[in-house]
Amino acid sequence: MKPLIRRLSRIADSSSCNRNRSGDIHHPTSTYSSSVFLVKRATVASSVPSGHVPVNVGEDKERFVVSAELLNHPVFVGLLNRSAQEYGYTQKGVLHIPCNVFVFEQVVESLRSGIADDTSELIASLSGEDVSTE
């Protein structure tokens, strides 16, 4: 797990401009806050600020930018374990998390608001799977 987290913390988009799904070119801008639990839905491909990791969530692989500090939280470690089980440790590029986007957003919001105790139960109830860290 440590090599995966180290690798994820080094992932950054090195291009100066990127293409979105329709092929239009967008130049990245830095509009990110310095919040510890920053999660921003990336509507277009953009550069990843230092200390953050790009994450694709769900079957449609919606892109989010997540603070690397969030990766150490036990609930997020459970999501990383689920990702490792489904995709293995050999996946390249952006991390894929097999979780419903709504569930992911609720998990992040509960972590941000400090009510993370019920987060594992929330994930299990909405996704039908257990993401315990044991």
Swiss-Prot record:
<dbReference type="GO" id="GO:0009734">
    <property type="term" value="P:auxin-activated signaling pathway"/>
</dbReference>
<comment type="similarity">
    <text>Belongs to the ARG7 family.</text>
</comment>
<keyword id="KW-0927">Auxin signaling pathway</keyword>
<keyword id="KW-0341">Growth regulation</keyword>
<dbReference type="GO" id="GO:0005737">
    <property type="term" value="C:cytoplasm"/>
</dbReference>
<protein>
    <recommendedName>
        <fullName>Auxin-responsive protein SAUR40</fullName>
    </recommendedName>
</protein>
<keyword id="KW-0963">Cytoplasm</keyword>
<keyword id="KW-0217">Developmental protein</keyword>
<dbReference type="Pfam" id="PF02519">
    <property type="entry name" value="Auxin_inducible"/>
</dbReference>
<comment type="function">
    <text>Provide a mechanistic link between auxin and plasma membrane H(+)-ATPases (PM H(+)-ATPases, e.g. AHA1 and AHA2), and triggers PM H(+)-ATPases activity by promoting phosphorylation of their C-terminal autoinhibitory domain as a result of PP2C-D subfamily of type 2C phosphatases inhibition, thus leading to the acidification of the apoplast and the facilitation of solutes and water uptake to drive cell expansion. Plays a role in the regulation of cell expansion, root meristem patterning and auxin transport.</text>
</comment>
<comment type="subunit">
    <text>Interacts with and inhibits PP2C-D subfamily of type 2C phosphatases such as PP2C67/PP2C-D1.</text>
</comment>
<dbReference type="InterPro" id="IPR003676">
    <property type="entry name" value="SAUR_fam"/>
</dbReference>
